[in-house]
Amino acid sequence: MSESQTLVVKLGTSVLTGGSRRLNRAHIVELVRQCAQLHAMGHRIVIVTSGAIAAGREHLGYPELPATIASKQLLAAVGQSRLIQLWEQLFSIYGIHVGQMLLTRADMEDRERFLNARDTLRALLDNSIVPVINENDAVATAEIKVGDNDNLSALAAILAGADKLLLLTDQPGLFTADPRSNPQAELIKDVYGIDDALRAIAGDSVSGLGTGGMGTKLQAADVACRAGIDTIIAAGNRPDVIGHAMAGLPVGTCFHAQESPLENRKRWIFGAPPAGEITVDAGATQAILERGSSLLPKGIKIVSGNFSRGEVIRIRNSEGRDIAHGVSRYNSDALRLIAGQHSQQIDAILGYEYGPVAVHRDDMIIR
């Protein structure tokens, strides 16, 4: 492990609180110690931290608040400053500075903002500063939220050009069944491809303390692995889990990266949360999946959501299954007008055209 590597460590609420109502500072100190040890060895560390709402609730003395988005954003606004202060305080013990980055989905959807976020993150790393990343919960609405820090950590790993992504949770890894209810469940140590059977095993279990369950961790692993990043799910309370994961020792479930990772532009397409979606017919589905063709307006059946030209959208077949993500050549209003029409009719219908395809194959990632 002598060569410098970049590791993204995602710490969920259940890890930071130990299942309690307050931040477990003693455990966070230990996690920081492990990160500082790797930092001293020349490795680059990125922290994706949950816990802003928990920190805000603790700081305000556990107030009785209505279960509304405004209440959560209030707690996040109070807690985020406390959280970053804690990370700075603990890393400073080892002479390490931290830099806060608060992101939303909009930072990933727009190519220019994506590149700006990437440059900021890499500048922090180049100057031996540990980036501490969280979603901007105090201002993010449902429309611009990534939604959970598992998927945010995968996007952060792509931005950082990471070698590994470590998702720390209250479980030792992915099991063949829920170990809390099935004593026969076995730990899955290695995964070389994520399929529907594995997604069914992961289910949608949530600890109740955060927004992510094993299902979202699988989504994050899928995104990261396709971008060439090994991903590990492991227990946050396992001794020296961060150092052992970095050294390649077995610590949980390892999702092995694709041997041929996506090039940079397609990493952005794959990582950006879709701004909308379109449903295509059987002919278009076959052309995309079997021939790698571009999507023509003729094959579009339904356009859902409101999105601009140049934004990433989800492409689904008539059964509702995701088949691809891609950059739309037209906005949602225009696509609704030309859906089901031949490409030669685009100019007559819209009064302009940006070419004969709705999504070009060079701007598309097959799911």
Swiss-Prot record:
This is Glutamate 5-kinase. Catalyzes the transfer of a phosphate group to glutamate to form L-glutamate 5-phosphate. Its main location: cytoplasm. One of its GO terms (molecular function) is RNA binding. Pfam families: AA_kinase, PUA. Pathway: Amino-acid biosynthesis; L-proline biosynthesis; L-glutamate 5-semialdehyde from L-glutamate: step 1/2. The keyword Kinase applies. It is found in: Cytoplasm. It catalyses: L-glutamate + ATP = L-glutamyl 5-phosphate + ADP. Gene3D superfamilies: Acetylglutamate kinase-like (3.40.1160.10), PUA domain (2.30.130.10). GO terms for cellular component: cytosol. It comes from Klebsiella pneumoniae subsp. pneumoniae (strain ATCC 700721 / MGH 78578). It comes from the Bacteria. ATP binds at K10, T169, D170, T211, G212, G213, M214, G215, T216, K217. Residues 275-353 form the PUA domain. Substrate binds at S50, D137, N149. One of its GO terms (biological process) is L-proline biosynthetic process. It is an enzyme of class 2 (transferase). Keywords: Amino-acid biosynthesis, ATP-binding, Cytoplasm, Kinase, Nucleotide-binding, Proline biosynthesis, Transferase. The lineage of its organism: Bacteria, Pseudomonadati, Pseudomonadota, Gammaproteobacteria, Enterobacterales. Belongs to the glutamate 5-kinase family.
